[in-house]
């Protein structure tokens, strides 16, 4: 893709209950300077086990998958804190992977509407719909809580990474996330914009399999892809 002008439209939702379209223009497929995964200070590592099925029900699923994701508080403390709080509250259980694009990613985490228009941060991190506010009382509802961007952490969008979905505006990440398949080298146009906050350490081949399911014209799986459960299984420094 080097030297070619390519446009990519990424439909993602955030705290406002309307879909948002992010248009990313890729001029050159060249990695950002200095954007290499730095494992020198991962901080506390939280391991989340996630069970996912593809089909109309778990009993009649065409496939069942279990993956483990390591989350690194040292590279994206707010993102990890929010994600873990959502996991512990059961917010991701029985939610949809609402968007699937082969050779790109699978996206879920909209526990409000299940279609990419909902979700929010698990706590107050200083932003309300992307606007920095001094006081939480100035944000009209917890459903408008969003995350500060932590995309300058040196981690890039290579295979098996987990990253936070957001709009084209800064600091608008909430609860929606996307997982990058194992057959991808790097999505350079996302680096420095979306925050990578961990990686799939077990079962990344399942992300690749799920990224290849049949979808409709809106990138929605024809047969549902459902996160049955997400559970914290380990913590370590």
PLM-predicted stretches and their roles:
Residues 35-237:
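Cross-family detector of peptidyl-prolyl cis-trans isomerase
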Residues 1-42:
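Secretory targeting signatures
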